[in-house]
Amino acid sequence: MAPSFDTLTEQDLHEEEEEEIDFSDLKEQYEVKLEEGLDTFVVIDGLPVVPEESRQKLIKFLLRKLNTVGHTSEDAVFMPLNDKNMSEGFAFVEYETPEQAIAAVKQLHGVPLDKKHTLAVNKLMDIDRYGREGRIDEEYKPPTIEPFKEKEHLRSWLGDANARDQFALYRGDKVGVFWNNKSNPPENVVDRAHWTQLFVQWSPKGTYLASVHPQGVQLWGGPAFSKQKQFPHPFVQLVEFSPGESYLTTWSARPIQVEEGHPVLTYEEDGKNIIIWDIVTGKPLRSFVSHDLTAGPGGDGEPKKKVQWPAFKWSADEKYVARMQQHQSISIYELPRMNLLGKTSVKIDGVMDFEWSPATVVREGVKQYEQLLCFWTPEIGSNPARVALMSVPSKEIVRTRNLFNVSDVKLHWQSQGTYVCVKVDRHSKSKKSMATNLEIFRVREKGVPVEVVDSLKDTVINFAWEPNGGRFVAITTGEAPSGAAVLPKTSVSFFAPEKKGVSAGNFKVVRTIEKKTSNAIYWSPKGRFVVVATVHSQTNFDIDFWDMDFEGEKPEGEKDLAANLQLMKTVEHYGVTDIDWDPTGRYVVSSASVWTHSMENGYNIHTFAGQTLAEHPTDKFKQFIWRPRPPTLLSKEEQKQVRKNLREYSKEFDEEDKYAVDIANTAVVETRKRVLNEWAAWIRREKEMLAEEKDAYGVPEDVDSSKQAKDAPAVSEDQGETVVEEIVEEIIEENEEVIG
């Protein structure tokens, strides 16, 4: 019978009281914390010793400094006097909040009050905590020095005898790092379950592998991928490295809540979304609140917000980092102090986007150091849209260009900073049709001339410069009907400069391939080869491999251009979502991630020319990323010498490849020999057992078979002349014909 109130005993009532629901976690979360303690007090030391009649005057003078970091008053400053009615050289100050007290310690400690006196500011709680009797041992004891432990070599993978590359593979709940073995199965380096909660990311030079967790970010490295650094940022969602791996930016949609006594984070980070970290020390340099971008009206008419990422963009040499407040300004900070350059942001009305040059540029006629930054503003009232180049640290505008009838602008720097292409989407006066112009700034030339490429009649949906080169590819499309299930037809245009002596000539179309569905461009990191693909499609999966410097016959109409275009191969990869070149430009991986769809997930490895080496269907495949390599240490002369002797090196590499194949074939032959020996031994044993049974039952012995069993020779591994023949049948063609 089910228990009821009437059937409850006295013992049951007491048990109910004992088993009362525990609300302690909810109480802790929602409890109103009363202010208590001495967190709002600071102690100011290093003050002048003055008589009682001058004390008030000194307090008023001191308040000028104190109120620069918070709010306090004369009543909140206590300056004690001794028996001689003279001040003691220190004072107690109460601020309105603990955060103001922390700011006073950070910003006023060590600040001169006048020529003879320098302020020493400490929290009263710290003095109580560390200065209490018994906390400090008055007798000196030398510190314990830990025995030296040699650190792991963080770039050990570069010493691989076969110059192989590594990649990280995230599938299911496991993350592994593997060696690429071309067509052979990859060799595992490390494989761990639950290594990350969101994704993994390599640092730009491949030194660290970052894993993302609710508690923060961890960096791993060395031959065994041991833990190198930790960056506690609760509920972190995005990470970004600086180009030289010195700094790390982390972002979370949730404002940080710093608990008292946190070993790394302080009240300065409380309520912030973004932290910039020093990777070497593992400490935060500065924290910020997010600035969201507007992304057009939402369904309810309200403007949608999208995350501005990367929130901070780095100069090529890591000396500066900048962020944009859309429509208002660009703030440039100096590293490593993270102070605002010139103490003010650059006010730019309407600013929509900006990009640093990816390399330090030396402009013609300019001798002083500079980093270049490009930004654009839309049309405001009667003022045209504008693209400008700014020199940093001077903040001088070195080139501007006005634009009209602008719908959108995208900025594309060439990897060496030689060019910046401004992709301008223009609307007609009736605003019913769209077209794209390319405005190319020749940054290194005197006066920064601008070349306009207006041969494209449709809208450019993708654009990519050749790394370390002067060619580019653009994909265009007409206006697709909204809600169309079929991909719109696209055209792929290959551009190259004309041959004109030392300097590059104007950009001309090498060739345009029409009636495609391609929507993505992936250049080899070494240039020359480019993959043009259709990704994130449900119907088309073409991957085209192009060579821009084909060594065959050049068409007559393209002889004046610095290119010889050739389609090497087209392959298909069902459901392809991502394409990744390895850092040497030898291999390409196409992959289908479960993050996009759950059909036939996995990855395929191809050569640069499109030959498929291996297919790896992988259940719950999520992410494939090659490990980057640091820049080469060879000088330009040494690199030139290597290219000159490349044919000789190629012979050595071919011999090594042949030797590796021979070893693999030898292993197969040895395995087959072993299996054959085992089979022959089994036959011999069976025949001997059969002969013994016949003898036991009095069955006449077959002399020939017994003799054959005893005389059956073993296949020795030392017999070099043993030939193992394997017959493989393959159907070349099959025809079915109906007769009658």
Swiss-Prot record:
<dbReference type="InterPro" id="IPR015943">
    <property type="entry name" value="WD40/YVTN_repeat-like_dom_sf"/>
</dbReference>
<dbReference type="InterPro" id="IPR034363">
    <property type="entry name" value="eIF3B_RRM"/>
</dbReference>
<dbReference type="Pfam" id="PF00076">
    <property type="entry name" value="RRM_1"/>
</dbReference>
<dbReference type="GO" id="GO:0043614">
    <property type="term" value="C:multi-eIF complex"/>
</dbReference>
<feature type="repeat" description="WD 2">
    <location>
        <begin position="232"/>
        <end position="289"/>
    </location>
</feature>
<keyword id="KW-0963">Cytoplasm</keyword>
<dbReference type="GO" id="GO:0071540">
    <property type="term" value="C:eukaryotic translation initiation factor 3 complex, eIF3e"/>
</dbReference>
<dbReference type="InterPro" id="IPR000504">
    <property type="entry name" value="RRM_dom"/>
</dbReference>
<keyword id="KW-0677">Repeat</keyword>
<feature type="domain" description="RRM">
    <location>
        <begin position="40"/>
        <end position="126"/>
    </location>
</feature>
<feature type="repeat" description="WD 4">
    <location>
        <begin position="513"/>
        <end position="556"/>
    </location>
</feature>
<keyword id="KW-0648">Protein biosynthesis</keyword>
<dbReference type="InterPro" id="IPR012677">
    <property type="entry name" value="Nucleotide-bd_a/b_plait_sf"/>
</dbReference>
<dbReference type="Pfam" id="PF08662">
    <property type="entry name" value="eIF2A"/>
</dbReference>
<feature type="repeat" description="WD 3">
    <location>
        <begin position="302"/>
        <end position="343"/>
    </location>
</feature>
<comment type="subunit">
    <text>Component of the eukaryotic translation initiation factor 3 (eIF-3) complex.</text>
</comment>
<keyword id="KW-0853">WD repeat</keyword>
<feature type="compositionally biased region" description="Polar residues">
    <location>
        <begin position="1"/>
        <end position="10"/>
    </location>
</feature>
<dbReference type="GO" id="GO:0033290">
    <property type="term" value="C:eukaryotic 48S preinitiation complex"/>
</dbReference>
<dbReference type="GO" id="GO:0010494">
    <property type="term" value="C:cytoplasmic stress granule"/>
</dbReference>
<dbReference type="GO" id="GO:0071541">
    <property type="term" value="C:eukaryotic translation initiation factor 3 complex, eIF3m"/>
</dbReference>
<keyword id="KW-0694">RNA-binding</keyword>
<dbReference type="GO" id="GO:0031369">
    <property type="term" value="F:translation initiation factor binding"/>
</dbReference>
<comment type="function">
    <text>RNA-binding component of the eukaryotic translation initiation factor 3 (eIF-3) complex, which is involved in protein synthesis of a specialized repertoire of mRNAs and, together with other initiation factors, stimulates binding of mRNA and methionyl-tRNAi to the 40S ribosome. The eIF-3 complex specifically targets and initiates translation of a subset of mRNAs involved in cell proliferation.</text>
</comment>
<dbReference type="GO" id="GO:0003723">
    <property type="term" value="F:RNA binding"/>
</dbReference>
<dbReference type="GO" id="GO:0003743">
    <property type="term" value="F:translation initiation factor activity"/>
</dbReference>
<dbReference type="InterPro" id="IPR035979">
    <property type="entry name" value="RBD_domain_sf"/>
</dbReference>
<comment type="similarity">
    <text>Belongs to the eIF-3 subunit B family.</text>
</comment>
<protein>
    <recommendedName>
        <fullName>Eukaryotic translation initiation factor 3 subunit B</fullName>
    </recommendedName>
</protein>
<feature type="repeat" description="WD 5">
    <location>
        <begin position="571"/>
        <end position="609"/>
    </location>
</feature>
<dbReference type="GO" id="GO:0042802">
    <property type="term" value="F:identical protein binding"/>
</dbReference>
<feature type="compositionally biased region" description="Acidic residues">
    <location>
        <begin position="13"/>
        <end position="22"/>
    </location>
</feature>
<feature type="region of interest" description="Disordered">
    <location>
        <begin position="695"/>
        <end position="721"/>
    </location>
</feature>
<dbReference type="InterPro" id="IPR011400">
    <property type="entry name" value="EIF3B"/>
</dbReference>
<dbReference type="GO" id="GO:0001732">
    <property type="term" value="P:formation of cytoplasmic translation initiation complex"/>
</dbReference>
<keyword id="KW-0396">Initiation factor</keyword>
<feature type="region of interest" description="Disordered">
    <location>
        <begin position="1"/>
        <end position="22"/>
    </location>
</feature>
<dbReference type="GO" id="GO:0016282">
    <property type="term" value="C:eukaryotic 43S preinitiation complex"/>
</dbReference>
<dbReference type="InterPro" id="IPR013979">
    <property type="entry name" value="TIF_beta_prop-like"/>
</dbReference>
<feature type="repeat" description="WD 1">
    <location>
        <begin position="193"/>
        <end position="230"/>
    </location>
</feature>
